[in-house]
Amino acid sequence: MSVISMKQLLEAGVHFGHQTRRWNPKMKKYIFVERNGIYIIDLQKTVKKLEEAYDFMRQVGQDGGKVLFVGTKKQAQEAIKDEAERSGNYYINQRWLGGTLTNFGTIQKRVARMKQIEKMEEEGTFEVLPKKEVIQLKKEHERLIKFLGGIRDMHDLPDVMFVVDPRKERIAVAEARKLNIPLVGIVDTNCDPDEIDYVIPANDDAIRAVKLLTAKMADALIESKQGEEEAPAVEAAAE
Protein backbone atom coordinates (compact mmCIF):
# COMPACT_ATOMS: atom_id res chain seq x y z
CA MET A 1 0.00 0.00 0.00
CA SER A 2 1.26 3.46 -0.90
CA VAL A 3 2.35 5.81 1.87
CA ILE A 4 0.36 8.64 0.27
CA SER A 5 -2.15 9.09 -2.54
CA MET A 6 -1.87 11.41 -5.51
CA LYS A 7 -5.22 12.91 -4.44
CA GLN A 8 -3.83 13.91 -1.03
CA LEU A 9 -0.83 15.56 -2.66
CA LEU A 10 -2.97 17.47 -5.17
CA GLU A 11 -5.42 18.67 -2.52
CA ALA A 12 -2.57 20.00 -0.39
CA GLY A 13 -0.99 21.81 -3.37
CA VAL A 14 2.23 19.83 -3.12
CA HIS A 15 2.72 20.11 -6.90
CA PHE A 16 3.10 23.91 -7.05
CA GLY A 17 6.75 24.89 -7.36
CA HIS A 18 8.28 28.36 -7.54
CA GLN A 19 8.19 30.87 -10.37
CA THR A 20 10.33 29.79 -13.31
CA ARG A 21 12.78 32.66 -12.80
CA ARG A 22 13.45 31.40 -9.25
CA TRP A 23 14.64 27.87 -9.82
CA ASN A 24 17.63 25.62 -9.38
CA PRO A 25 18.45 23.71 -12.59
CA LYS A 26 19.39 20.68 -10.47
CA MET A 27 15.66 20.27 -9.72
CA LYS A 28 14.87 19.81 -13.42
CA LYS A 29 14.39 16.03 -13.10
CA TYR A 30 11.59 16.58 -10.56
CA ILE A 31 9.67 19.10 -12.69
CA PHE A 32 6.69 17.90 -14.71
CA VAL A 33 5.79 21.04 -16.67
CA GLU A 34 5.82 24.85 -16.62
CA ARG A 35 2.42 26.51 -16.31
CA ASN A 36 1.71 30.26 -16.18
CA GLY A 37 5.26 31.05 -15.12
CA ILE A 38 5.28 28.44 -12.34
CA TYR A 39 6.95 25.05 -12.30
CA ILE A 40 4.69 22.09 -11.58
CA ILE A 41 6.39 19.29 -9.67
CA ASP A 42 6.07 15.72 -10.95
CA LEU A 43 3.97 14.12 -8.21
CA GLN A 44 4.77 10.58 -9.34
CA LYS A 45 8.36 11.34 -8.40
CA THR A 46 7.22 12.94 -5.13
CA VAL A 47 5.34 9.74 -4.22
CA LYS A 48 8.40 7.60 -4.98
CA LYS A 49 10.82 9.85 -3.08
CA LEU A 50 8.44 10.20 -0.15
CA GLU A 51 8.24 6.41 0.12
CA GLU A 52 12.04 6.22 0.19
CA ALA A 53 12.20 8.86 2.93
CA TYR A 54 9.40 7.10 4.85
CA ASP A 55 11.22 3.75 4.77
CA PHE A 56 14.43 5.44 5.91
CA MET A 57 12.69 7.23 8.80
CA ARG A 58 10.97 4.02 9.87
CA GLN A 59 14.36 2.28 9.97
CA VAL A 60 15.81 5.15 12.00
CA GLY A 61 12.98 4.71 14.50
CA GLN A 62 13.48 0.94 14.65
CA ASP A 63 17.16 1.49 15.39
CA GLY A 64 16.25 3.82 18.27
CA GLY A 65 17.47 6.90 16.42
CA LYS A 66 16.39 10.46 17.19
CA VAL A 67 15.38 13.09 14.63
CA LEU A 68 15.71 16.87 14.76
CA PHE A 69 12.85 18.55 12.86
CA VAL A 70 13.87 21.97 11.50
CA GLY A 71 11.64 24.58 9.86
CA THR A 72 11.78 28.24 10.86
CA LYS A 73 9.64 29.76 8.09
CA LYS A 74 6.13 30.81 9.14
CA GLN A 75 4.46 28.11 7.03
CA ALA A 76 6.43 25.35 8.77
CA GLN A 77 6.63 26.43 12.42
CA GLU A 78 3.44 24.82 13.69
CA ALA A 79 3.82 21.53 11.79
CA ILE A 80 7.46 21.16 12.83
CA LYS A 81 6.62 21.55 16.53
CA ASP A 82 3.45 19.41 16.44
CA GLU A 83 4.93 16.50 14.48
CA ALA A 84 8.22 16.43 16.38
CA GLU A 85 6.32 16.30 19.67
CA ARG A 86 3.82 13.73 18.36
CA SER A 87 6.65 11.39 17.39
CA GLY A 88 8.71 12.02 20.53
CA ASN A 89 11.52 13.88 18.78
CA TYR A 90 13.15 17.32 18.81
CA TYR A 91 12.55 20.52 16.87
CA ILE A 92 13.75 24.02 16.08
CA ASN A 93 11.03 26.21 14.62
CA GLN A 94 12.23 29.72 15.41
CA ARG A 95 15.67 31.05 14.47
CA TRP A 96 18.47 28.54 13.97
CA LEU A 97 21.26 29.59 16.31
CA GLY A 98 24.61 29.16 14.56
CA GLY A 99 26.55 26.31 16.16
CA THR A 100 23.45 24.45 17.37
CA LEU A 101 25.13 21.26 16.15
CA THR A 102 28.76 22.20 15.49
CA ASN A 103 29.09 23.94 18.87
CA PHE A 104 26.74 21.62 20.72
CA GLY A 105 28.49 21.98 24.09
CA THR A 106 27.78 25.72 24.21
CA ILE A 107 24.14 25.15 23.25
CA GLN A 108 23.87 22.55 26.04
CA LYS A 109 25.07 25.20 28.50
CA ARG A 110 22.27 27.51 27.35
CA VAL A 111 19.74 24.69 27.83
CA ALA A 112 21.16 24.06 31.32
CA ARG A 113 20.74 27.76 32.08
CA MET A 114 17.09 27.57 30.96
CA LYS A 115 16.49 24.64 33.34
CA GLN A 116 18.35 26.45 36.13
CA ILE A 117 15.98 29.43 35.89
CA GLU A 118 12.99 27.06 35.98
CA LYS A 119 14.40 25.40 39.11
CA MET A 120 14.89 28.80 40.76
CA GLU A 121 11.23 29.60 40.21
CA GLU A 122 10.07 26.16 41.44
CA GLU A 123 12.15 26.41 44.61
CA GLY A 124 10.84 29.88 45.45
CA THR A 125 14.07 31.78 44.76
CA PHE A 126 12.09 34.35 42.74
CA GLU A 127 10.21 35.33 45.90
CA VAL A 128 13.35 36.55 47.66
CA LEU A 129 15.00 38.25 44.67
CA PRO A 130 14.49 41.92 43.76
CA LYS A 131 11.52 42.37 41.39
CA LYS A 132 13.75 43.87 38.67
CA GLU A 133 16.03 40.82 38.71
CA VAL A 134 13.04 38.45 38.50
CA ILE A 135 11.74 40.32 35.43
CA GLN A 136 15.16 39.99 33.77
CA LEU A 137 15.31 36.26 34.57
CA LYS A 138 11.82 35.70 33.14
CA LYS A 139 12.78 37.55 29.95
CA GLU A 140 15.93 35.47 29.64
CA HIS A 141 13.91 32.29 30.16
CA GLU A 142 11.32 33.30 27.53
CA ARG A 143 14.07 33.82 24.98
CA LEU A 144 15.75 30.51 25.79
CA ILE A 145 12.44 28.62 25.59
CA LYS A 146 11.63 30.27 22.26
CA PHE A 147 14.85 29.19 20.57
CA LEU A 148 15.86 26.07 22.49
CA GLY A 149 12.66 24.69 24.04
CA GLY A 150 12.35 22.08 21.29
CA ILE A 151 15.78 20.61 22.07
CA ARG A 152 15.70 20.82 25.88
CA ASP A 153 15.91 17.02 26.16
CA MET A 154 18.33 16.50 23.26
CA HIS A 155 21.43 15.38 25.17
CA ASP A 156 23.34 14.16 22.12
CA LEU A 157 23.57 15.12 18.46
CA PRO A 158 20.56 13.87 16.47
CA ASP A 159 20.86 10.80 14.26
CA VAL A 160 18.93 12.48 11.43
CA MET A 161 17.75 15.97 10.52
CA PHE A 162 14.44 16.60 8.75
CA VAL A 163 14.30 20.04 7.16
CA VAL A 164 11.67 22.14 5.43
CA ASP A 165 13.26 24.39 2.77
CA PRO A 166 17.02 23.64 2.85
CA ARG A 167 17.65 26.95 1.07
CA LYS A 168 16.29 28.92 4.01
CA GLU A 169 17.86 26.54 6.52
CA ARG A 170 21.25 26.51 4.78
CA ILE A 171 23.22 27.06 8.02
CA ALA A 172 21.46 24.10 9.68
CA VAL A 173 22.04 21.98 6.57
CA ALA A 174 25.73 22.94 6.44
CA GLU A 175 26.20 21.99 10.10
CA ALA A 176 24.50 18.62 9.62
CA ARG A 177 26.60 17.88 6.53
CA LYS A 178 29.80 18.82 8.35
CA LEU A 179 28.93 16.29 11.07
CA ASN A 180 27.75 13.61 8.60
CA ILE A 181 24.19 13.69 9.95
CA PRO A 182 21.83 12.32 7.26
CA LEU A 183 19.34 14.86 5.90
CA VAL A 184 15.73 14.33 4.84
CA GLY A 185 14.04 17.39 3.35
CA ILE A 186 11.09 19.00 1.62
CA VAL A 187 12.86 20.45 -1.41
CA ASP A 188 11.15 23.00 -3.69
CA THR A 189 12.15 23.94 -7.25
CA ASN A 190 14.46 26.74 -6.02
CA CYS A 191 16.59 24.47 -3.79
CA ASP A 192 19.73 22.40 -4.33
CA PRO A 193 18.76 18.72 -4.00
CA ASP A 194 22.42 17.63 -3.84
CA GLU A 195 22.62 18.86 -0.24
CA ILE A 196 19.88 16.46 0.93
CA ASP A 197 20.23 12.69 1.26
CA TYR A 198 16.49 11.95 1.02
CA VAL A 199 14.84 14.55 -1.21
CA ILE A 200 11.05 15.01 -1.11
CA PRO A 201 10.34 17.28 -4.12
CA ALA A 202 7.41 19.44 -3.04
CA ASN A 203 5.91 22.86 -2.40
CA ASP A 204 7.58 24.21 0.75
CA ASP A 205 5.43 27.36 0.95
CA ALA A 206 1.90 25.98 1.42
CA ILE A 207 1.01 25.23 5.04
CA ARG A 208 -1.12 22.21 4.06
CA ALA A 209 1.66 20.71 1.94
CA VAL A 210 4.26 21.15 4.66
CA LYS A 211 1.91 19.73 7.31
CA LEU A 212 1.01 16.69 5.19
CA LEU A 213 4.60 15.72 4.40
CA THR A 214 5.99 16.48 7.86
CA ALA A 215 3.20 14.37 9.38
CA LYS A 216 4.19 11.47 7.13
CA MET A 217 7.72 11.58 8.50
CA ALA A 218 6.33 11.53 12.05
CA ASP A 219 4.02 8.64 11.06
CA ALA A 220 7.04 6.60 9.94
CA LEU A 221 8.78 7.13 13.28
CA ILE A 222 5.61 6.28 15.22
CA GLU A 223 4.99 3.19 13.09
CA SER A 224 8.48 1.90 13.91
CA LYS A 225 7.72 2.19 17.64
CA GLN A 226 4.36 0.43 17.26
CA GLY A 227 6.16 -2.46 15.62
CA GLU A 228 8.41 -2.75 18.69
CA GLU A 229 5.43 -2.72 21.05
CA GLU A 230 3.56 -5.34 19.05
CA ALA A 231 6.53 -7.71 18.79
CA PRO A 232 6.58 -8.84 22.48
CA ALA A 233 2.82 -9.40 22.35
CA VAL A 234 3.18 -11.59 19.26
CA GLU A 235 5.99 -13.56 20.93
CA ALA A 236 3.91 -14.07 24.08
CA ALA A 237 0.95 -15.30 22.04
CA ALA A 238 3.18 -17.78 20.22
CA GLU A 239 4.42 -19.38 23.46
UniProtKB/Swiss-Prot annotation:
Gene3D superfamilies: Glucose-6-phosphate isomerase like protein, domain 1, Helix hairpin bin. It comes from the Bacteria. Coiled coil: none annotated. GO terms for molecular function: structural constituent of ribosome. Pfam families: Ribosomal_S2 (PF00318). Keywords: Ribonucleoprotein, Ribosomal protein. GO terms for cellular component: cytosolic small ribosomal subunit. CDD domains: RPS2. Transmembrane segments: none annotated. GO terms for biological process: translation. HAMAP family: Ribosomal_uS2_B. Belongs to the universal ribosomal protein uS2 family. This is Small ribosomal subunit protein uS2. The lineage of its organism: Bacteria, Bacillati, Bacillota, Bacilli, Bacillales. The gene is rpsB.
